């Protein structure tokens, strides 16, 4: 099984890039994990928010493979405590055969067709974060989940 984080647009803040890369590398000690970047849309001045979401949605769908289990990181998704998230991940590790794909959308969220393609939605907080920052929060939580499952010293209850 492989874990993939699919994001729209590259991370631009240098301090986020450094921290994200650190957690991605740490996480790879436990699982097969990668981050795929869908290029940001160009020339969006004349596009409505809905049009941008639709165009991003087309690119997201092209990046998905048959058999992928798709989980959206969405403000309306299910919330977990860190230990609950670790247990959820463990269940997925026993039931998903191919890729477990977590998707972070662009600044306006997801097109309806992406919601239709998803099997689940999870939320990392009731608060709103930039789509750049949530990448760091997610990879940290995935790493934390791996240390919980492997009895590592990182997480404290």
Curated annotation (Swiss-Prot):
Location of the protein in the cell: Cytoplasm
Function (record text): Specifically methylates the pseudouridine at position 1915 (m3Psi1915) in 23S rRNA.
Cellular component terms per the entry's GO annotation: cytoplasm
Predominant localisation class: cytoplasm
Substrates-to-products reaction catalysed: pseudouridine(1915) in 23S rRNA + S-adenosyl-L-methionine = N(3)-methylpseudouridine(1915) in 23S rRNA + S-adenosyl-L-homocysteine + H(+)
CDD domains: RlmH-like
Positions bound to S-adenosyl-L-methionine: 73, 105, 124-129
EC nos: 2.1.1.177
UniProt-recorded name of the protein: Ribosomal RNA large subunit methyltransferase H
GO molecular function per UniProt: rRNA (pseudouridine-N3-)-methyltransferase activity
PANTHER family cross-referenced by the UniProt entry: METHYLTRANSFERASE, RIBOSOMAL RNA LARGE SUBUNIT METHYLTRANSFERASE H
Homology family: Belongs to the RNA methyltransferase RlmH family.
Annotated InterPro entries: Alpha/beta_knot_MTases (IPR029028), RlmH-like (IPR003742), tRNA_m1G_MTases_N (IPR029026)
Record keyword rRNA processing present: yes
Subunit structure, interactors included: Homodimer.
UniProt keyword annotations, A-Z: Cytoplasm, Methyltransferase, rRNA processing, S-adenosyl-L-methionine, Transferase
Enzyme class: transferase
NCBIfam families (UniProt xref): PRK00103.2-4
